A protein has these predicted regions:
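Anionic, Ser/Thr-rich low-complexity intrinsically disordered regions
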Residues: 31, 61-63, 95-96, 103-107
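A cytosolic small-molecule/anion-sensing beta-strand core signal
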Residues: 55-56, 71-72, 90
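Glycine- and acidic-residue-biased ligand/ion/polar-headgroup-sensing regions
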Residues: 48-49, 53-59, 64
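A short, N-terminal "cap"/entry segment at the start of jelly-roll beta-barrel domains
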Residues: 1-27, 107
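Conserved short histidine dyad/triad with adjacent acidic residue
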Residues: 31-45
Length: 108
């Protein structure tokens, strides 16, 4: 029921990117992704629905070929299997929610 920051699963991703798995259930998962300015989340796709909230900073998101800039307080929806990637324009943090949970994020 409660997710504690001290218990987060921390994983370095691409250069300048760190993922923290904060909380999950059988059906969903929440992660915090920290980015240094200029860092990229490489293009990928997955069968999960994803909603991303910009907690800090500014980012350029591309989803299925459409690119938009999003800033603190904005959000982004990625449907299942959408090809997407991100570039950090101003150092910041994203909060990702996945449905269903990302089993691959729980493996060490």
């Amino acid at each position: 029921m409660f997710g504690y920051n001290a218990d987060a699963i921390v994983t370095p991703c691409e250069p300048g990117v760190v993922r923290r798995v904060l909380s999950w259930s059988d059906e969903m998962m929440m992660c915090e992704i920290s980015f240094e300015k200029g860092a990229k989340g490489n293009f990928h796709h997955h069968p999960h629905e994803q909603i991303t909230y910009v907690a800090e900073g500014s980012f350029s998101f591309t989803i299925d070929g459409e690119t938009k800039t999003v800033n603190k307080g904005d959000s982004v929806y990625m449907p299942p299997n959408a090809e997407h990637g991100v570039t950090c324009l101003e150092g910041g943090k994203l909060v990702d929610v996945f449905h269903p949970k990302r089993e691959d994020f729980l493996r060490k």
